[in-house]
């Protein structure tokens, strides 16, 4: 006789059965997968004990693919079909790809995202990333002995909506359920903060293969709050390799190189950089296709000299993030280093000098992000023990707003707001009988729409015709935990609604974000004057238009002289509104407003008499 197992809906019939979830660090150079086993997070290795999976995919003519070390081993021989650092291309168009002239790939400028021509056909960064994620999923299932319920995948804090969506798409293509996208610095904070029960202000300095992130965190009991973020999505260890490659070419006086020679020297450059983490000098040897021999000695002094500008380039966003957080370097309790590139002695020295303390390095910088992601995945899968609930508060990098009359920007969600977040604001119509409203979604810190980045446009139609100012349109901005923005506009009387989900076809580079912030600081005074001028002009237009309508409907309440006086005031407002003096416009508007007070009172009396006509006193009681 078989026994039927009965359990609560949605619950496992085995009360102690764990739901298997993993954390994945989808890196530019290397990727990792980690899981919590026996309450301890650990990185899962392959059958040969290797934790790191090179983020390299090679496509073959038979349409199969090699992933990881096998692909990396063939990179020199088959550079065009061996894709490295694909993370740099996620959500990017062809014009956004940095150092494209040094790349051996045949790019295809496809709509929305660049693609790469390979022996197995044209491949998108989403498809290539999916190969890496599928390999990590298989490794995890082999190690854990069961299927996964999902994964937490980490992304740089500065990934925009298009890049985050591309990451989600890659995961789904790899057969992974995305429990959450988690910012890499936040993942590091989970690993360090909980292991060490840390509280206070911390900085997470994350220099990976292709991206740099700096986050200022406030760690208190149960709450991880990101006070500010910054960084550069086109700066990482690869750039140090690239600079060293240029030095090799210069020192060896090499002629234009083939793609295979270029890849060979890049491999040698990366090996030399890594060797200097343990030694004061190293030798670079290579034999090119032409038979030419490269033999150079690289010292740590030379390496520091030729890469000093890259080190300094990382410190500019650090200063900016500290200013945004309202703290000084001396207030930072500790500095967490993340990413394999932070093993470079020049980086550790520069960070230590800047903050006046030795950075924390007790966790492997290559693994710390994956470990934190695994802890978060374990929590989301429902495996946490009592007291293991954490609140993760990430932030958005730039303010989100909407264009209003006069080309102004009304900020709905200010930058550095914690996410997920939803904010709403009510707007109204400008003209009588207006039945539609254009919604222009903007990103940036400037006061004028023309100076901000346009994210999306849509229209709300079907607004009931009313007098200007009577309709109420509620505009709601919602940013989810993955940083994706949705905007909804709803007319409150009729319930008509329109919405848009913002997935920009091209990503926003971090130097663009830095430039936008710098412009907002530099142009703050000018912007405020421009805003004041635009606001006064809008008010002038509104009052003149309202007065003109009143004259058309109730002009008989005025004598000829009174009407002439009002029209003269209107003409003065129109003329002054074309000028640049917002105070003069305000004064003219006030004169028109005061000059029509008596007219407004007479119109009110007429309206009241009209409303009461034929009514009995008892009806009014």
Swiss-Prot record:
The keyword Lipid metabolism does not apply. CDD domains: ASKHA_NBD_HSP70_HscA (cd10236). Keywords: ATP-binding, Chaperone, Nucleotide-binding. One of its GO terms (biological process) is iron-sulfur cluster assembly. One of its GO terms (molecular function) is ATP-dependent protein folding chaperone. It comes from the Bacteria. Gene3D superfamilies: 1.20.1270.10, 3.30.420.40, Actin, Chain A, domain 4, Substrate Binding Domain Of DNAk, Chain A, domain 1. Coiled coil: none annotated. Chaperone involved in the maturation of iron-sulfur cluster-containing proteins. Has a low intrinsic ATPase activity which is markedly stimulated by HscB. Belongs to the heat shock protein 70 family. This is Chaperone protein HscA homolog. The gene is hscA.
């Amino acid at each position: 006789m078989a026994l039927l197992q009965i359990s609560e809906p949605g619950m496992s019939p085995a009360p102690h059965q764990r739901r298997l979830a993993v954390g994945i660090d989808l890196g530019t150079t290397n990727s990792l997968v980690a899981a919590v086993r026996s309450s301890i997070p650990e990185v899962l290795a392959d059958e040969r004990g290797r934790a790191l999976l090179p983020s390299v995919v090679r496509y073959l003519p038979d349409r199969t693919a090699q992933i990881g070390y096998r692909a990396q081993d063939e990179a020199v021989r088959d550079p065009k079909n061996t894709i490295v650092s694909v993370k740099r291309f996620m959500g990017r168009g062809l014009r956004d790809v940095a150092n494209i002239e040094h790349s051996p790939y045949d790019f295809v400028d496809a709509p929305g995202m660049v693609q790469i021509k390979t022996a197995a056909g044209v491949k998108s960064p989403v498809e290539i990333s999916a190969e890496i994620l599928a390999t990590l999923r298989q490794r995890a299932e082999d190690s854990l002995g069961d299927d996964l319920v999902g994964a937490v995948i980490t992304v740089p804090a500065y990934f925009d909506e298009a890049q985050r969506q591309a990451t989600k798409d890659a995961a789904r293509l790899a057969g992974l359920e995305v429990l959450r996208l988690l910012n890499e610095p936040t993942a590091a904070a989970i690993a360090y903060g909980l292991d060490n029960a840390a509280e206070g202000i911390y900085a997470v300095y994350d220099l990976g293969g292709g991206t740099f992130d700096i986050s200022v965190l406030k760690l208190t009991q149960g709450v991880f709050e990101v006070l500010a973020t910054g960084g550069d999505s086109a700066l990482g260890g690869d750039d140090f390799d690239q600079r060293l490659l240029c030095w090799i070419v210069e020192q060896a006086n090499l002629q234009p190189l083939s793609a295979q020679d270029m890849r060979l020297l890049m491999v040698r450059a990366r090996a030399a950089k890594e060797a200097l983490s343990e030694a004061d000098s190293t030798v670079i040897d290579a034999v090119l296709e032409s038979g030419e021999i490269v033999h150079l000695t690289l010292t740590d002094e030379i390496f520091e000299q030729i890469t000093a500008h890259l080190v300094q380039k990382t410190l500019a966003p650090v200063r900016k993030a500290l200013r945004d957080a309202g703290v000084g370097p001396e207030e930072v309790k500790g500095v967490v280093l993340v990413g394999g590139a932070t093993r470079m002695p020049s980086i550790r020295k520069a960070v230590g000098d800047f903050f006046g303390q030795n950075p924390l390095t007790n966790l492997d910088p290559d693994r710390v992000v994956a470990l934190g992601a695994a802890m978060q995945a374990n929590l989301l899968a429902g495996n946490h023990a009592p007291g293991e609930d954490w609140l993760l508060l990430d932030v958005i990098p730039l303010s989100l707003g909407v264009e209003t009359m006069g080309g102004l920007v009304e900020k709905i969600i200010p930058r550095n707001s914690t996410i997920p977040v939803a904010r709403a604001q009510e707007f109204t119509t400008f003209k009588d009988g207006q039945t539609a409203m254009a919604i222009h979604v903007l990103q940036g810190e400037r006061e004028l729409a023309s100076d901000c980045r346009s994210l999306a446009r849509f229209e709300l139609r079907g607004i009931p015709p009313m007098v200007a100012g009577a309709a109420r349109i509620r505009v709601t901005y919602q940013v989810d935990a993955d940083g994706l923005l949705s905007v909804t506009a709803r007319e409150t009387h009729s319930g008509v609604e329109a919405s848009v989900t913002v997935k920009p076809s091209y990503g926003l580079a971090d130097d663009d974000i830095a430039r936008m912030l710098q412009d907002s600081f530099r142009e703050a005074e000018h912007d405020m004057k421009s805003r004041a001028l635009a606001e006064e002009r809008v008010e002038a237009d509104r009052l003149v238009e309202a007065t003109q309508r009143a004259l058309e409907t109730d002009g008989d309440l005025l004598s000829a002289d009174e009407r002439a006086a009002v029209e003269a005031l209107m003409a003065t407002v129109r003329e002054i509104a074309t000028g640049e003096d917002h105070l003069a416009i305000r004064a003219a508007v006030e004169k028109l407003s005061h000059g029509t007070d008596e007219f407004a009172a007479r119109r009110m009396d007429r309206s009241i008499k009209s409303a009461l006509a034929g009514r009995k006193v008892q009806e009014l009681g």
